[in-house]
Amino acid sequence: MAGRVESSIGGGEIDEEGDERGSMWDLDQSLDQPMDEEAGRLRNMYREKKFSAFLLLQLSFQSLGVVYGDLGTSPLYVFYNTFPRGIKDPEDIIGALSLIIYSLTLIPLLKYVFVVCKANDNGQGGTFALYSLLCRHAKVSTIPNQHRTDEELTTYSRTTFHERSFAAKTKRWLENGTSRKNALLILVLVGTCMVIGDGILTPAISVLSAAGGLRVNLPHINNGIVVVVAVVILVSLFSVQHYGTDRVGWLFAPIVFLWFLFIASIGMFNIWKHDPSVLKAFSPVYIFRYFKRGGQDRWTSLGGIMLSITGIEALFADLSHFPVSAVQFAFTVIVFPCLLLAYSGQAAYLRKYPHHVEDAFYQSIPKRVYWPMFIIATAAAIVASQATISATFSLIKQALAHGCFPRVKVVHTSRKFLGQIYVPDINWILMILCIAVTAGFKNQNQIGNAYGTAVVIVMLVTTLLMMLIMILVWRCHWVLVLLFTLLSLVVECTYFSAVLFKVNQGGWVPLVIAAAFLVIMYVWHYGTLKRYEFEMHSKVSMAWILGLGPSLGLVRVPGIGLVYTELASGVPHIFSHFITNLPATHSVVIFVCVKNLPVYTVPQEERFLVKRIGPKNFHMFRCVARYGYRDLHKKDDDFEKRLFESLFLFLRLESMMEGCSDSEDYSVCGSQQRQSRDGVNGNGNEIRNVSTFDTFDSIESVIAPTTTKRTSHTVTGSSQMSGGGDEVEFINGCRDAGVVHIMGNTVVRARREARFYKRIAIDYVYAFLRKICRENSAIFNVPQESLLNVGQIFYV
């Protein structure tokens, strides 16, 4: 193998001499992407499957327990939060019911179920899923570690634009401003923080409202006992989270289905028994009459009506568990009509007994079914809380993958379902805050005010992100985008103006919680970005490394050194710092970059990308491990074993390509022949770059379509496998001598000339977060006896 080999990721890294790429680079690029039109169809693997009617019914039924628990338990507390001071005019009940009906129609049904749910990222929902979609279609990520080889993943899908289109102009506008990228990130973080707030408020208000039913049948019980019962249920709920929902998850759908069946039946009974005239609320005229009667109370009552659509944020965040068609079917056929009947039945009861508004749900239940209904209501409240807690865990995991949250332990609780995870630290924080809110307010009205504030802000964030999705991903006409955005903002800003009146009545709680999490998440991301920029600017020249010779000017001791770095190109500063202070290194050096991509998952066979650095006798490699935001670093993944399997595959494939590189059929082997950048054609002898996509599928895609003539070249390549086999044996021997994981133990400090707020953020907040978060060695399950930390100070 003549000449020098430059380090690269997918053949794309360019250092001082990186512009010279030879014929092997061209071959690699052919191997590293779909070979033909058929292979091109593998891109964007996610396609919603066509289901039989029976399977669709089954999935729709199962989605009730995961997706709709929170939305379904809203009848427990909506009317009391709408009329906290009592009902002064019975006609107000009709106006409030009409508002509830059209709120459920416009927001959950039309906006979320039929529009927002279609904006999923390969079936994944939530604010970070929308952000990942945007990051793939425009360069809006604040950490610029993406590479074009990432786009060849089968799960990486994107669309192209006409240069003069509205989408292309919007894309350039977003990409050309750092402040716009930061604003987009902050918008996503605000939405995420509000959903975390929901993870605190949903269990509090749902369980407290369900437990409050005790006062109806046991009047001697005071509110203090109800709060104690609610706290006991909450402690039990959070304490069993580490078991996961795999064992009891099958109960969720039947519980929620029974809940919807019962509230719909009771609703129909109350309409028939008390006041069938409430059905006139389906006319929007009564909304106009409701506000025409005037008064601030009617406007602020929108904050209570807002609670009728809570749970839509969890609906979108939990979307990954089921196909969109099942979620849509369940809502339109079961959830929507049952909720309309439940609210109409309560309204009919309140028209006759307006003084029962504080416990409207339980008061409207016939006495004979009170206790069964109380048990089902409590169970449904627990299921609703569980769904929101699980959604919070998923969002934290996504934030971790995007570098927006301190490293915390993530536990996979199910062998069957990838999305079922448990985050211990977050679980106990949620429990403490949830108990504090429940015991502190002791009243569902103030918790409801807080809940409404969080939900409406999440809705506003989703609308703004959907506007960009419609432009950049769906490429909708600007008129359609404007229509959707304006209609959504008019409704949501109306609700937002109403909840602002209740900020001092409990609405401040989610704002404080969100502000605290926002500071943590943004400071962590800012510190991570500055660390990455420092590493990029201080990486070592490739010419310097190659100039040291095969021994690197050091003593090469037996063994393998895995040098962990955040850089996907170049030689990291940690390595030069290491060999400067300790003039010895291992016989084989592998630079390991663990990289998170804006995709939901990276298939295991595409996880690792292996490259060679320098000539063969340098024994230096780079391995990029790529993960999506749903992928987990599990103990049973055996990261080190898979890394070496990919390395050995690389060496064999490299040897095979060397065998066919001098043949006259080389262009066929590489699928296509392209002029190399250094002027050497496909039949040239000088090889500047070796880069392969480390999957057996890549090899098969080269070998399978070959002719008889190709077969002879393949045999020739196999006869030259001995070179690759010798190196495999050499590396195996070094592996037996010991593998050492070399990681940077960096201390990040702000420069002396930095502004005051930057010094506070870096020297105190970021430093504190790094001190309490998990070490990288724990995330990758590195044994302590094989770990070598290299201390450094980064001045950013």
From Swiss-Prot:
GO terms for molecular function: potassium ion transmembrane transporter activity. The chain crosses the membrane at residues 59-79, 96-116, 185-205, 218-238, 249-269, 299-319, 322-342, 369-389, 421-441, 454-474, 481-501, 506-526. One of its GO terms (cellular component) is plasma membrane. Residues 80-95, 206-217, 270-298, 343-368, 442-453, 502-505 are extracellular. It comes from the Eukaryota. InterPro entries: K+_transporter (IPR003855), K_trans_C (IPR053952), K_trans_N (IPR053951). It is a multi-pass membrane protein. Keywords: Cell membrane, Ion transport, Membrane, Potassium, Potassium transport, Transmembrane, Transmembrane helix, Transport. Residues 1-30 are annotated as: Disordered. Residues 1-58, 117-184, 239-248, 320-321, 390-420, 475-480, 527-796 are cytoplasmic. Pfam families: K_trans, K_trans_C. Its main location: membrane. Putative potassium transporter. NCBIfam families: kup (TIGR00794). Belongs to the HAK/KUP transporter (TC 2.A.72.3) family. This is Potassium transporter 10. It comes from Arabidopsis thaliana (Mouse-ear cress).
